C-alpha cells in the first residue's frame, strides 16, 4: 500500500509519486483562489468597490481574511483580479460567436444580442463596471491583461466595420471601441 500524506486540509491521499502532494496542494490553492474571487465578485457587485469589505469577502469565501492577503496584496488587487476574470469570461463567450464568419450586419446584430443577453444573465458584470466607472477606470487602466483581451475584439469589430463599409452597409469612420462601448 502506498504511503499516506497528511495535507493542510486534513485529507488523506495515497501517494503514487513525490509530486502528488504538491499537485494536490496546487489544486487546493487554485480552488481557494477561485472561491475568494467568486466571493469578491458578489461583494463588489453588491456593494461597489468603496462599500465592499475584505472581512465580508473572507466570510463569503469561508477563508481567513489573512489568506486573502496571501493571494492578493490588497483590495485594489483583488478588485482588479475580479474585473480581469469577468472580462476573460465575456471575451471567451464572444469568441464563440465567430463574428468574422458572418456578414457585417449579421455580425453586429449577433454581438449586440449576445451582449444584451450576457448583461441580463450576468448583472454583476454591469455592477462591477459601474463601480469601476465611478473610480474613473483606475483599475482597468492598470491592467495589461484586459487590454490584451480587448484587442482581438476591437480588431474583429474594425474588420467587420470595414467589410460593412465596402459593402455599403455601414458608413466609414466608425470607431470600433466607441461602437462597442
Please annotate each region the language model reported.
Residues 1-31, 42:
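N-terminal intrinsically disordered/low-complexity leader segments
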Residues 32-40, 57, 82-86, 90, ...:
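Generic hydrophobic, amphipathic alpha-helix propensity
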Residues 35, 43-77, 81:
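Helix-turn-helix
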Residues 46-50, 100-101, 122, 167:
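Short coil/turn segments at alpha/beta junctions that flank glycine-rich nucleotide-binding fingerprints
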Residues 72, 131-137:
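Short helix-capping/turn signature of helix-turn-helix
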Residues 75, 82, 86, 90, ...:
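Hydrophobic/aromatic residues within well-ordered alpha-helical segments
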Residues 95-127, 147-150, 154, 176-180:
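Hydrophobic alpha-helical connector segments
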Residues 140, 150-179:
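Hydrophobic alpha-helical bundle segments that form small-molecule/ligand-binding pockets
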Amino acid at each position: 500500500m502506498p504511503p499516506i500524506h497528511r495535507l493542510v486540509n486534513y485529507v488523506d491521499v495515497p501517494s503514487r509519486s513525490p509530486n502528488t502532494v504538491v499537485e494536490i496542494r496546487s489544486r487546493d490553492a487554485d480552488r481557494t483562489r477561485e472561491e475568494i474571487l467568486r466571493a469578491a465578485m458578489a461583494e463588489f457587485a453588491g456593494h461597489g468597490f468603496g462599500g465592499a469589505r475584505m472581512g465580508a469577502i473572507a466570510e463569503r469565501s469561508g477563508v481567513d481574511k489573512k489568506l486573502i492577503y496571501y493571494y492578493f496584496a490588497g483590495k485594489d488587487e483583488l478588485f482588479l483580479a475580479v474585473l480581469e476574470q469577468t472580462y476573460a469570461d465575456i471575451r471567451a463567450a464572444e469568441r464563440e460567436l465567430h463574428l468574422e464568419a458572418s456578414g457585417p450586419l449579421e455580425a453586429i446584430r449577433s454581438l449586440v444580442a449576445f451582449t444584451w443577453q450576457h448583461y441580463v444573465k450576468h448583472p454583476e458584470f454591469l455592477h462591477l463596471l459601474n463601480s469601476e466607472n465611478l473610480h474613473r477606470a483606475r483599475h482597468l487602466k492598470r491592467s495589461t491583461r484586459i487590454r490584451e483581451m480587448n484587442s482581438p475584439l476591437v480588431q474583429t469589430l474594425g474588420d467587420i466595420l470595414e467589410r460593412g463599409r465596402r459593402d455599403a452597409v455601414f458608413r466609414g469612420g466608425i470607431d470600433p471601441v466607441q461602437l462597442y462601448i
